[in-house]
Amino acid sequence: MAKGLLVTYALWAVGGPAGLHHLYLGRDSHALLWMLTLGGGGLGWLWEFWKLPSFVAQANRAQGQRQSPRGVTPPLSPIRFAAQVIVGIYFGLVALISLSSMVNFYIVALPLAVGLGVLLVAAVGNQTSDFKNTLGAAFLTSPIFYGRPIAILPISVAASITAQKRRRYKALVASEPLSVRLYRLGLAYLAFTGPLAYSALCNTAATLSYVAETFGSFLNWFSFFPLLGRLMEFVLLLPYRIWRLLMGETGFNSSYFQEWAKLYEFVHSFQDEKRQLAYQVLGLSEGATNEEIHRSYRELVKVWHPDHNLDQTEEAQRHFLEIQAAYEVLSQPRKPRGSRR
């Protein structure tokens, strides 16, 4: 069935960062890339506005072809090469955050993550690359920079160069049912976000505070578009919701689960509820004056400073960071409800 340009633009506008239009066009690798990067940080999604006609034409041509081009090498694309390097670094950073505690992380997990990121970009559209050679380049480069986070960059560059040298057109395959494609994409999405969610659940309060601030700042960008903001919130918290549904509350250590619950509330209601939580942390009632907020903050910082609690450093650090975050929230001028500024 021929793909329509108007339908593609509609899906691009409604669910572009989630890759709905690519799913419609049969570009599953591109859809997965957009799911994992939220449309290339939004920039790739916007840039595609002018590329959609060529994507639709390419999808319709593929339906009419009976065999893929043989002996023809796709043209070299600097944009694809740059995207391979960037996504490889991105996958490596995610692995560094979520899997760095693994034994032989710099030998196995890091090059595998970077190589898969490079291969994902290489498989966008009607092109692909050699799986073994690309991963082989990543694994051969990794020991040279063993134990150094900077290893992500040379591994990504080496894998990207190899992927470009081995680039080729995809072989034509019979179309698969949508349910099978969605199942495969869902597994890939969970494989990427699962370790990251687990690390966030079991990591220190510093990581939780950083993630909360990042999510809150990101969601604030969508304050002008409530529906889109709720969609982004749903996507960001989807791994947590799935994990909680499967594991239940018994699957978490109680103290860390309570910390994540606070983070969840922080993100889920990032304006009014965020301030209410900040008041609770500082032990104040809602509507306290700036002087009361500052006084409570100074008193609690003295009590919970890690240098003053050497016998319970971890708990002191958690409270100290919560107090710092709460004070920053309450120090910001409150936006009136319904305001557009």
Curated annotation (Swiss-Prot):
It comes from the Eukaryota. SUPFAM superfamilies: Chaperone J-domain. Keywords: Chaperone, Membrane, Transmembrane, Transmembrane helix. This is DnaJ homolog subfamily C member 22. It comes from Pongo abelii (Sumatran orangutan). Residues 3-50 form the TM2 domain. Its main location: membrane. The lineage of its organism: Eukaryota, Metazoa, Chordata, Craniata, Vertebrata. One of its GO terms (cellular component) is membrane. The keyword Iron-sulfur does not apply. Residues 277-341 form the J domain.
